[in-house]
Amino acid sequence: MGSGSGWKGRDVISILDFDRDSLEQLFEVADKFSSLLRERGRIPLLEGYIVALAFFEPSTRTRLSFETAAKRLGADTIGFTSEEAISIAKGETLADTIRMLDSYADMIVLRHRYEGAALYAAEIAEHPVINAGDGKQHHPTQAMLDLYTVRKLFGTIDGLTYGVLGDLRYGRAASSFILALTIYRPRMIYLISPPLLRVRPEVRMVLDERGMRYREVESLEEVLGELDVLYVTRIQRERFPDQREYEKVRGSYRVTLELLEQHARRELRILHPLPRVDEIAPEVDGTPYAAYFEQARNGVPVRMALLALIAGREV
């Protein structure tokens, strides 16, 4: 469902489905919700709506921020947090589960381990489908809140030098963020990873097609001093087909305060989609470098804006 530049009734499958104007509209609405939430806890634009949260994979921040966003807007939520909790465990197909949810709810927020699951669901459902992460490449709403965070921190997304660090092969948040940057005009993108975890060919193809300046490197120290934004990701253990491969790359990078003080610009800001394991040392948390908790907080106003725009409700 839903196409064109307008938001009403639109599916959210890939960040590449959106242009700059659509994203700027989203960010302006998110700014309004950010201000309104400081004044009052509830803005009942979606009173009477039901939002289905269909999480076939575990999630903390994404699921809870969508649930909070829906409830702050006055909507009710239904859903589940794993396949084991529903009839999929008894052999029900994804298609039948989507049809059931579509008959109950006004929107479906879907997370699934298989790539293409959100697009498949959108083809079946009459109501809008929002991809909350599927497979290894797409996590569009995470990319939206990541861009929004950069915009709030720097006043712009253009003209900055970005480093994306860690699991660029299996990490869908990293892939989506890299793809999202191609909608803007970054000065430079450094893709920092071990050889086993280099960015996927289809992501590299988009970078090339859109004329992005980027470079693949293994050493963080080599480029850290140039960066305005460092986007750190954990190594995605659960997505490795071979655990021996995981053991080769686990702990490849660790961002410490000492490393930052030696190499980073004072203006550098660090993002992380969370959860983290040990890739950012806890002593970084209390420094101006750390923007990842603010980034997580931005999930609620951005997802409120998303739900309201798709419902066609004005702030």
Curated annotation (Swiss-Prot):
InterPro entries: Asp/Orn_carbamoyltranf_P-bd (IPR006132), Asp/Orn_carbamoylTrfase (IPR006130), Asp/Orn_carbamoylTrfase_sf (IPR036901), Asp_carbamoyltransf (IPR002082), Asp_carbamoyltransf_Asp/Orn-bd (IPR006131). Its EC number is 2.1.3.2. It is an enzyme of class 2 (transferase). GO terms for biological process: 'de novo' pyrimidine nucleobase biosynthetic process; 'de novo' UMP biosynthetic process; amino acid metabolic process. Keywords: Pyrimidine biosynthesis, Transferase. Pathway: Pyrimidine metabolism; UMP biosynthesis via de novo pathway; (S)-dihydroorotate from bicarbonate: step 2/3. Carbamoyl phosphate binds at R61, T62, R111, H139, Q142, L274, P275. It catalyses: carbamoyl phosphate + L-aspartate = N-carbamoyl-L-aspartate + phosphate + H(+). The keyword Transferase applies. PROSITE patterns: CARBAMOYLTRANSFERASE (PS00097). GO terms for molecular function: amino acid binding; aspartate carbamoyltransferase activity. L-aspartate binds at K90, R172, R234. NCBIfam families: asp_carb_tr, PRK00856.1. HAMAP family: Asp_carb_tr. Belongs to the aspartate/ornithine carbamoyltransferase superfamily. ATCase family. Heterooligomer of catalytic and regulatory chains. PANTHER family: ASPARTATE CARBAMOYLTRANSFERASE, ORNITHINE CARBAMOYLTRANSFERASE, MITOCHONDRIAL. Catalyzes the condensation of carbamoyl phosphate and aspartate to form carbamoyl aspartate and inorganic phosphate, the committed step in the de novo pyrimidine nucleotide biosynthesis pathway. This is Aspartate carbamoyltransferase catalytic subunit. The gene is pyrB.
